[in-house]
Amino acid sequence: MKIQKHKEIYWGELRGASISKTRKDFTYLYGSTIIFHSPDQVYFENKLIASGQTIHEWSSSWNYQGDRQVPSLPLLKRGRSYSLTRDMTSYPSESVFLKLIFFDRYNREVSNHVERSDKMTFTYPEEAYSYKVQLLSAGVESFEFHCLRIEEILEESNG
């Protein structure tokens, strides 16, 4: 198995859910302390955030004319296998889940995957047109976020 590197995905801009009517690429701001040390080092703290709440979201699909933003996730190829890894430290440990949601061309959810560990592997569905990655609270109080990595898994042929 070989892994083809992709660009690292950083936190990006702060966009509260109240700003974004479609709730694309937003950050949970209510009662949160967020400190940007650098693009690859963001501190988040909110001791009262409910479990299951989306903390931050990245999307591969945008309406540039409406949002004036470019997609924060790379385009993926249908039917290919990928690895999604997060580089972060949370307190308490393992208190942030990764959620991956796939959508068809009419923005209907095709499937989703939720993972507690720092790494998940998935195959991009044939019917998928776009996708989102979310950080979900699972009793988190604070964390230090560095980046996400999406890498294609290339199968080696023996020949």
UniProtKB/Swiss-Prot annotation:
Signal peptide: none annotated. Keywords: Protein transport, Translocation, Transport. One of its GO terms (biological process) is protein transport. Disulfide bonds: none annotated. Disruption phenotype: Loss of export of cell wall protein GspB, the protein accumulates intracellularly in protoplasts. InterPro entries: Acessory_Sec_prot_Asp3. Belongs to the accessory Sec system protein Asp3 family. Part of the accessory SecA2/SecY2 system specifically required to export GspB, a serine-rich repeat cell wall protein encoded upstream in the same operon. Part of the accessory SecA2/SecY2 protein translocation apparatus required to export cell wall protein GspB. Binds the Ser-rich domains (SSR1 and SSR2) of non-glycosylated GspB, binds much less to glycosylated protein. This is Accessory Sec system protein Asp3. It comes from Streptococcus gordonii.
